[in-house]
Amino acid sequence: MKIKNSLKALRERHRNNRMVRRKGRVYILNKTNPRFRARQG
């Protein structure tokens, strides 16, 4: 999982990316291609 300051560019890298907020953190999740996962931090 990558940790990035800005997730907007990462979200657009794959069409199945989903932006999710959990416990005050923002994640990008991708079930079809998990290598695109990221967390904002």
Swiss-Prot record:
InterPro entries: Ribosomal_bL36, Ribosomal_bL36_sp, Ribosomal_L36_bact. Keywords: Ribonucleoprotein, Ribosomal protein. Pfam families: Ribosomal_L36 (PF00444). GO terms for molecular function: structural constituent of ribosome. GO terms for cellular component: ribonucleoprotein complex; ribosome. GO terms for biological process: translation. Belongs to the bacterial ribosomal protein bL36 family. HAMAP family: Ribosomal_bL36. This is Large ribosomal subunit protein bL36. The lineage of its organism: Bacteria, Pseudomonadati, Pseudomonadota, Alphaproteobacteria, Hyphomicrobiales.
